[in-house]
Amino acid sequence: MSMPATSTKTTKLATSLIDEYALLGWRAMLTEVNLSPKPGLVDRINCGAHKDMALEDFHRSALAIQGWLPRFIEFGACSAEMAPEAVLHGLRPIGMACEGDMFRATAGVNTHKGSIFSLGLLCAAIGRLLQLNQSLTPTTVCSTAASFCRGLTDRELRTNNSQLTAGQRLYQQLALTGARGEAEAGYPLVINHALPHYLTLLDQGLDPELALLDTLLLLMAINGDTNVASRGGEGGLRWLQREAQTLLQKGGIRTLADLDYLRQFDRECIERNLSPGGSADLLILTWFLAQI
Protein backbone atom coordinates (compact mmCIF):
# COMPACT_ATOMS: atom_id res chain seq x y z
CA MET A 1 0.00 0.00 0.00
CA SER A 2 1.13 3.54 -0.66
CA MET A 3 1.94 5.39 2.57
CA PRO A 4 1.71 9.19 2.83
CA ALA A 5 4.66 10.96 4.35
CA THR A 6 4.29 11.82 8.01
CA SER A 7 7.35 13.31 9.72
CA THR A 8 11.11 13.36 9.56
CA LYS A 9 11.29 12.86 13.32
CA THR A 10 12.19 9.37 14.46
CA THR A 11 10.30 7.32 17.00
CA LYS A 12 11.80 5.25 19.76
CA LEU A 13 8.77 2.97 19.98
CA ALA A 14 9.28 -0.75 19.44
CA THR A 15 7.52 -2.17 16.40
CA SER A 16 6.09 -4.94 18.56
CA LEU A 17 4.43 -2.38 20.85
CA ILE A 18 2.98 -0.45 17.91
CA ASP A 19 1.63 -3.67 16.40
CA GLU A 20 0.12 -4.68 19.73
CA TYR A 21 -2.05 -1.57 19.90
CA ALA A 22 -2.92 -1.81 16.20
CA LEU A 23 -4.07 -5.38 16.78
CA LEU A 24 -6.31 -4.19 19.61
CA GLY A 25 -7.91 -1.69 17.23
CA TRP A 26 -8.64 -4.45 14.72
CA ARG A 27 -10.02 -6.71 17.44
CA ALA A 28 -12.23 -3.87 18.70
CA MET A 29 -13.83 -3.47 15.27
CA LEU A 30 -14.41 -7.22 14.93
CA THR A 31 -15.76 -7.51 18.47
CA GLU A 32 -18.36 -4.83 17.76
CA VAL A 33 -19.59 -6.11 14.41
CA ASN A 34 -19.74 -9.76 15.53
CA LEU A 35 -21.70 -8.82 18.66
CA SER A 36 -25.30 -10.03 18.21
CA PRO A 37 -28.13 -9.16 18.25
CA LYS A 38 -27.69 -5.38 17.85
CA PRO A 39 -30.70 -3.13 17.17
CA GLY A 40 -30.55 -1.74 13.64
CA LEU A 41 -26.90 -2.66 13.13
CA VAL A 42 -25.08 -5.23 11.01
CA ASP A 43 -24.28 -8.34 13.04
CA ARG A 44 -24.05 -12.13 12.70
CA ILE A 45 -27.84 -12.41 12.45
CA ASN A 46 -28.79 -9.83 9.83
CA CYS A 47 -27.81 -6.57 8.15
CA GLY A 48 -29.94 -4.40 10.41
CA ALA A 49 -31.33 -1.28 8.75
CA HIS A 50 -28.68 -1.51 6.01
CA LYS A 51 -29.40 -2.76 2.52
CA ASP A 52 -25.95 -1.98 1.13
CA MET A 53 -23.63 -3.82 3.52
CA ALA A 54 -23.11 -7.20 5.17
CA LEU A 55 -20.99 -8.76 7.90
CA GLU A 56 -18.26 -9.76 5.43
CA ASP A 57 -17.87 -6.13 4.34
CA PHE A 58 -17.01 -5.18 7.92
CA HIS A 59 -14.52 -8.02 8.23
CA ARG A 60 -12.74 -6.94 5.03
CA SER A 61 -12.87 -3.30 6.11
CA ALA A 62 -11.39 -3.99 9.54
CA LEU A 63 -8.51 -5.90 7.99
CA ALA A 64 -7.78 -3.05 5.57
CA ILE A 65 -7.84 -0.50 8.39
CA GLN A 66 -5.60 -2.60 10.63
CA GLY A 67 -2.71 -2.02 8.24
CA TRP A 68 -2.98 1.73 8.78
CA LEU A 69 -3.34 1.86 12.56
CA PRO A 70 0.45 1.60 13.10
CA ARG A 71 0.83 4.74 10.96
CA PHE A 72 -1.46 6.70 13.26
CA ILE A 73 0.56 5.54 16.28
CA GLU A 74 3.86 6.35 14.55
CA PHE A 75 2.67 9.81 13.58
CA GLY A 76 1.52 10.45 17.13
CA ALA A 77 5.01 9.54 18.34
CA CYS A 78 6.88 11.44 15.63
CA SER A 79 4.81 14.59 16.22
CA ALA A 80 5.13 14.45 20.02
CA GLU A 81 7.04 17.75 20.10
CA MET A 82 4.45 19.54 17.99
CA ALA A 83 1.65 21.60 19.50
CA PRO A 84 -1.30 19.21 19.90
CA GLU A 85 -3.55 21.45 17.78
CA ALA A 86 -1.19 20.90 14.83
CA VAL A 87 -1.38 17.11 14.95
CA LEU A 88 -4.82 16.72 13.37
CA HIS A 89 -3.64 18.35 10.13
CA GLY A 90 -0.91 15.71 9.81
CA LEU A 91 -3.31 12.88 10.59
CA ARG A 92 -5.72 13.79 7.81
CA PRO A 93 -3.72 12.38 4.85
CA ILE A 94 -3.20 9.13 6.75
CA GLY A 95 -6.92 8.95 7.48
CA MET A 96 -7.83 9.67 3.86
CA ALA A 97 -5.45 6.99 2.60
CA CYS A 98 -6.88 4.54 5.14
CA GLU A 99 -10.38 5.46 4.01
CA GLY A 100 -9.40 4.77 0.42
CA ASP A 101 -8.25 1.26 1.32
CA MET A 102 -11.50 0.71 3.23
CA PHE A 103 -13.57 1.64 0.18
CA ARG A 104 -11.46 -0.57 -2.07
CA ALA A 105 -11.88 -3.50 0.33
CA THR A 106 -15.67 -3.07 0.45
CA ALA A 107 -16.30 -2.07 -3.18
CA GLY A 108 -17.35 1.42 -2.13
CA VAL A 109 -19.34 0.66 1.03
CA ASN A 110 -18.80 3.00 4.00
CA THR A 111 -18.39 0.51 6.84
CA HIS A 112 -15.90 2.13 9.23
CA LYS A 113 -15.41 5.79 8.28
CA GLY A 114 -16.30 6.90 11.80
CA SER A 115 -13.93 4.36 13.32
CA ILE A 116 -11.06 5.53 11.14
CA PHE A 117 -11.53 8.99 12.65
CA SER A 118 -11.91 7.88 16.27
CA LEU A 119 -9.44 4.99 16.34
CA GLY A 120 -6.98 7.09 14.36
CA LEU A 121 -7.16 9.80 17.01
CA LEU A 122 -6.76 7.37 19.90
CA CYS A 123 -3.87 5.56 18.22
CA ALA A 124 -2.10 8.87 17.59
CA ALA A 125 -2.70 9.82 21.22
CA ILE A 126 -1.19 6.51 22.34
CA GLY A 127 1.88 7.14 20.19
CA ARG A 128 2.33 10.62 21.65
CA LEU A 129 1.99 9.43 25.25
CA LEU A 130 4.41 6.54 24.75
CA GLN A 131 6.97 8.78 23.05
CA LEU A 132 6.79 11.30 25.90
CA ASN A 133 6.89 8.56 28.57
CA GLN A 134 3.63 9.85 30.00
CA SER A 135 0.95 7.86 31.79
CA LEU A 136 -1.15 5.84 29.36
CA THR A 137 -4.68 5.30 30.65
CA PRO A 138 -8.10 5.56 29.00
CA THR A 139 -8.46 9.06 30.45
CA THR A 140 -5.06 10.34 29.29
CA VAL A 141 -5.55 8.80 25.84
CA CYS A 142 -8.91 10.52 25.41
CA SER A 143 -7.75 13.86 26.81
CA THR A 144 -4.76 13.78 24.46
CA ALA A 145 -7.05 13.03 21.51
CA ALA A 146 -9.22 15.95 22.62
CA SER A 147 -6.22 18.27 22.54
CA PHE A 148 -5.68 17.35 18.87
CA CYS A 149 -9.27 18.40 18.12
CA ARG A 150 -9.35 21.76 19.89
CA GLY A 151 -11.57 24.11 17.88
CA LEU A 152 -12.73 21.38 15.50
CA THR A 153 -16.45 21.86 16.12
CA ASP A 154 -16.22 25.61 15.55
CA ARG A 155 -14.20 25.18 12.37
CA GLU A 156 -16.23 22.43 10.74
CA LEU A 157 -19.78 22.61 12.12
CA ARG A 158 -20.44 26.25 12.93
CA THR A 159 -19.22 27.53 9.58
CA ASN A 160 -22.13 28.90 7.58
CA ASN A 161 -22.13 28.36 3.83
CA SER A 162 -24.62 27.56 1.11
CA GLN A 163 -23.48 23.94 0.74
CA LEU A 164 -24.08 22.50 4.20
CA THR A 165 -22.68 19.07 4.96
CA ALA A 166 -24.92 16.53 6.71
CA GLY A 167 -23.04 17.21 9.94
CA GLN A 168 -23.48 20.98 9.66
CA ARG A 169 -27.18 20.56 8.91
CA LEU A 170 -27.75 18.36 11.98
CA TYR A 171 -25.77 20.78 14.12
CA GLN A 172 -27.83 23.76 12.98
CA GLN A 173 -31.16 21.93 13.25
CA LEU A 174 -30.67 19.82 16.40
CA ALA A 175 -27.39 21.11 17.96
CA LEU A 176 -25.85 17.64 17.49
CA THR A 177 -22.05 17.75 17.28
CA GLY A 178 -21.58 14.07 16.44
CA ALA A 179 -18.17 12.44 16.24
CA ARG A 180 -16.35 15.79 16.11
CA GLY A 181 -17.93 17.10 19.29
CA GLU A 182 -17.39 13.87 21.19
CA ALA A 183 -13.72 13.80 20.18
CA GLU A 184 -13.14 17.45 21.05
CA ALA A 185 -14.71 16.87 24.48
CA GLY A 186 -12.45 13.89 25.18
CA TYR A 187 -15.07 11.17 24.62
CA PRO A 188 -17.10 11.81 27.80
CA LEU A 189 -19.80 9.32 26.81
CA VAL A 190 -17.14 6.62 26.84
CA ILE A 191 -14.97 7.77 29.75
CA ASN A 192 -17.78 8.83 32.10
CA HIS A 193 -20.49 6.34 31.14
CA ALA A 194 -19.87 3.41 28.80
CA LEU A 195 -16.41 2.33 29.98
CA PRO A 196 -17.14 2.32 33.74
CA HIS A 197 -20.49 0.63 33.05
CA TYR A 198 -18.85 -2.11 30.98
CA LEU A 199 -16.02 -2.69 33.46
CA THR A 200 -18.47 -2.84 36.38
CA LEU A 201 -20.53 -5.51 34.62
CA LEU A 202 -17.38 -7.53 33.93
CA ASP A 203 -16.35 -7.20 37.59
CA GLN A 204 -19.77 -8.56 38.54
CA GLY A 205 -19.05 -11.65 36.46
CA LEU A 206 -21.45 -10.94 33.61
CA ASP A 207 -20.71 -12.65 30.30
CA PRO A 208 -18.56 -10.25 28.20
CA GLU A 209 -20.96 -10.27 25.24
CA LEU A 210 -23.97 -9.55 27.43
CA ALA A 211 -21.98 -6.78 29.13
CA LEU A 212 -21.18 -5.22 25.75
CA LEU A 213 -24.79 -5.45 24.59
CA ASP A 214 -25.96 -3.74 27.77
CA THR A 215 -23.30 -1.07 27.27
CA LEU A 216 -24.51 -0.55 23.71
CA LEU A 217 -28.01 0.06 25.08
CA LEU A 218 -26.59 2.63 27.48
CA LEU A 219 -24.84 4.45 24.65
CA MET A 220 -27.99 4.39 22.53
CA ALA A 221 -29.94 5.91 25.42
CA ILE A 222 -27.58 8.86 25.99
CA ASN A 223 -25.87 9.50 22.64
CA GLY A 224 -27.15 12.19 20.29
CA ASP A 225 -26.42 9.83 17.41
CA THR A 226 -26.18 11.72 14.13
CA ASN A 227 -26.52 8.46 12.18
CA VAL A 228 -29.96 7.97 13.71
CA ALA A 229 -30.95 11.62 13.32
CA SER A 230 -29.91 11.68 9.66
CA ARG A 231 -32.25 8.74 8.97
CA GLY A 232 -35.14 9.45 11.32
CA GLY A 233 -34.87 13.10 12.29
CA GLU A 234 -35.31 14.29 15.85
CA GLY A 235 -38.35 12.05 16.30
CA GLY A 236 -36.44 8.94 15.32
CA LEU A 237 -33.56 9.81 17.62
CA ARG A 238 -35.81 10.49 20.62
CA TRP A 239 -37.75 7.27 19.99
CA LEU A 240 -34.57 5.19 19.90
CA GLN A 241 -33.22 6.84 23.04
CA ARG A 242 -36.50 6.23 24.90
CA GLU A 243 -36.66 2.58 23.84
CA ALA A 244 -33.09 1.94 24.94
CA GLN A 245 -33.69 3.71 28.26
CA THR A 246 -36.84 1.67 28.85
CA LEU A 247 -34.96 -1.59 28.35
CA LEU A 248 -32.27 -0.46 30.77
CA GLN A 249 -34.89 0.48 33.36
CA LYS A 250 -36.40 -3.00 33.03
CA GLY A 251 -33.07 -4.52 33.99
CA GLY A 252 -31.05 -4.38 30.78
CA ILE A 253 -29.29 -7.37 29.27
CA ARG A 254 -28.27 -9.78 32.00
CA THR A 255 -29.31 -13.22 30.70
CA LEU A 256 -29.68 -15.00 27.36
CA ALA A 257 -33.45 -14.65 27.74
CA ASP A 258 -33.03 -10.86 27.65
CA LEU A 259 -31.78 -11.13 24.07
CA ASP A 260 -35.42 -11.47 22.98
CA TYR A 261 -35.88 -7.79 23.91
CA LEU A 262 -32.97 -6.85 21.66
CA ARG A 263 -34.36 -8.93 18.79
CA GLN A 264 -37.67 -7.09 19.04
CA PHE A 265 -35.85 -3.75 19.27
CA ASP A 266 -33.87 -4.76 16.17
CA ARG A 267 -37.07 -5.49 14.22
CA GLU A 268 -38.49 -2.10 15.20
CA CYS A 269 -35.30 -0.28 14.19
CA ILE A 270 -35.32 -2.04 10.82
CA GLU A 271 -38.96 -1.06 10.27
CA ARG A 272 -38.08 2.56 11.04
CA ASN A 273 -34.81 2.40 9.04
CA LEU A 274 -32.77 3.48 12.08
CA SER A 275 -29.16 2.45 12.65
CA PRO A 276 -27.23 3.69 15.72
CA GLY A 277 -23.88 3.71 13.95
CA GLY A 278 -22.48 6.48 16.13
CA SER A 279 -23.12 4.43 19.25
CA ALA A 280 -21.51 1.42 17.58
CA ASP A 281 -18.38 3.52 16.96
CA LEU A 282 -18.32 4.50 20.64
CA LEU A 283 -18.72 0.85 21.64
CA ILE A 284 -15.61 0.05 19.60
CA LEU A 285 -13.71 2.70 21.58
CA THR A 286 -15.12 1.37 24.85
CA TRP A 287 -13.83 -2.14 24.21
CA PHE A 288 -10.50 -0.80 22.91
CA LEU A 289 -9.92 1.37 25.97
CA ALA A 290 -10.96 -1.44 28.30
CA GLN A 291 -7.93 -3.41 27.09
CA ILE A 292 -5.44 -0.64 27.99
From Swiss-Prot:
Record-linked NCBIfam families: citrate_citG (TIGR03125), PRK10096.1 (NF007503)
Gene symbol of the encoding locus: citG
Protein EC: 2.4.2.52
The protein's name: Probable 2-(5''-triphosphoribosyl)-3'-dephosphocoenzyme-A synthase
Family matches, as HAMAP family: CitG
Record field: catalytic activity: 3'-dephospho-CoA + ATP = 2'-(5''-triphospho-alpha-D-ribosyl)-3'-dephospho-CoA + adenine
Organism name: Shigella boydii serotype 18 (strain CDC 3083-94 / BS512)
One family name in Pfam for this protein: CitG
Keywords: ATP-binding, Nucleotide-binding, Transferase
Similarity section: Belongs to the CitG/MdcB family.
Any one GO molecular-function label of the UniProt entry: ATP binding
Entry superkingdom: Bacteria
Keyword Phosphoprotein: no
GO BP of this protein: prosthetic group biosynthetic process
Main enzyme class: transferase
Statement: the UniProt record of this protein carries the keyword Transferase: yes
